[in-house]
Amino acid sequence: MAKYKIAWLPGDGIGKDVLNAAKIVLDELKLDAEYIPGDIGWKFWCKEGNALPQRTIELLKKTDCSLFGAITSKPKEEAEAELDLSLKGKGYVYTSPIVKLRQLFNLRTNLRPCKAYPGNPLNYRDDIDLVVFRENTEDLYSGVEFHPLPKEVMDVLLKNHKSMKKFENTSLDDIAVSLRIVTRKACQNIVRDAFEYAKKHKRRSVTVVEKPNVIRETSGLMIREARKIAREYPGIPLWETNIDAMCMWLIKNPQDYDILVTSNMFGDIVSDLCAQLVGGLGFACSGNIGDDYAVFEPTHGSAPKYAGMNKVNPIATLLSVKLMLDWLSESQMATRLENAIATVIKEGKVRTYDMGGSSTTTQVAEEVARKL
């Protein structure tokens, strides 16, 4: 019986291509694991009205963690238009399966390392080593949205907040509302995770990234909790930066920053910016981590035009495997894998098209496997 059970979730588009690359490396590492395929993605939305079928949720409950490829996600109207004819008009509403997974399994911490590996021609600078901690279950991604705005909701808002007076005479059909929900507990958890990581890995600083000068209540709560928790880690300085200024400073002086911690939407934005500084989404790995379960994935999309072409850069996926190995306490394997990836990048002999080369997804994975 295998030591680990890992849910294998290719998803959409290039998801299968990059997970095939991951399997080449995992086989070479000889991780004692059983890989169990699960249904997830756009075709299941179209055929079943659910991109994350209940059978897949039950599968995940029986596994140690998941490795996830990529997902196609479309706006409400487009999603409804692509439903099977037999499902149309029956009240099905598309929800991103990865967002749903994060909430169902309380995968509260989104860990996104963005490190410049020497030899990567796409590096903005070679001395960038950032780690983004993004709260993963709340904020504008909580899914509490209204359109049109129900009259009873409008009445409550008008009664309780003077700023709603501006919209008093606007037709309810002309108002869309998405609630930014932030809880004290979630703020505490993500900030503490960031500081614990900084302590364990001997990092220089933690920067909390918010917008409390405008979004006073929700961003303000995050800032206040960050200040409290920072007192428990006197050797690690806490910096505070507004999200707009953070984007500017990351372009100007990315080497000055170390660990960034923020709420869900700001984290989604700033982590993609950080990824571009170290080569783009082809190098952007992530872990969605909870107390007893985790899902690891590259942060790129499904890139359907490249699906099945064996063309895309698998390094983001291979680095996600590295994060998975760390989480499984297979630290030696994780270090070997990262060193092999770094060597392949530095040598520059095997590169996919985004790096100016012509190697295939498989060839990059095989070269990494050889370096193991």
Segments the model singles out, each with a brief description of its role:
Residues D12-G15, D64, F133, A194, ...:
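Buried hydrophobic positions in well-ordered alpha/beta secondary-structure cores of metabolic enzymes
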Residues A22, L26, A226, T317-L325, ...:
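Buried hydrophobic packing segments
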Residues A33-E34, H201-E210, Y233-T241, E330-E338, ...:
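Flexible, glycine/charged-enriched surface loops at secondary-structure junctions
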